[in-house]
Amino acid sequence: AGALTARLAPEPDPALVRAVNAALILLADHELATSTMAVRVAASTRADLYDALLAGLGVVAGPLHGGASQLAYGLVRDAEQLGPERALDETLRWQHRLPGFGHSVYQGDDPRFTVLKGLVDDLWRPERRRILDTLLALAGQRALPGPNVDLGLGALMRAAGMAEDCGRTLFTIARVAGWTAHYLEELQERPIRYRARAVYATRP
């Protein structure tokens, strides 16, 4: 974590290194996310590890998966520059959804966000901390979905002074460890066990 932080952050300090290390742990694995499934499908065909990891990299590149923290970073940046309420309103107006909020697995807050939020709070000055707290409160008042790990990661990148695309880098580096474990696990299963069927549907 120390070497990675030194390359991504302009002023790496011990608190930031601890936060990045925690993020790497939190992001290493999360059940059968789409990129993890891609790795396991490749492993089921007995592709070698490097090819299976390439399958995961292709999927994680999507803005709704590994790149989602970049959109959340933009929301946090806009909340700082425009104010939380205006940032929320304009994001919903143009994107029709709030990046960094909602997750298919969790009904409420993503517990990974909760951990990252605590670490971000330690890095931010009180006035910047209040901006994120206000954004969260406004989202709650509007009954929007709870915050997810992408918001936590985007906020961490912002607090660290990192570039907005560093979240994707951190996410991918962390997830490679999890993918490798899934790859090895899949090799113990029956080969080519993922075979979906399709039903042809004509127009009425």
Predicted regions and their residues:
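Hydrophobic alpha-helical bundle cores within soluble ligand-binding/oligomerization subdomains
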Residues: 1-204
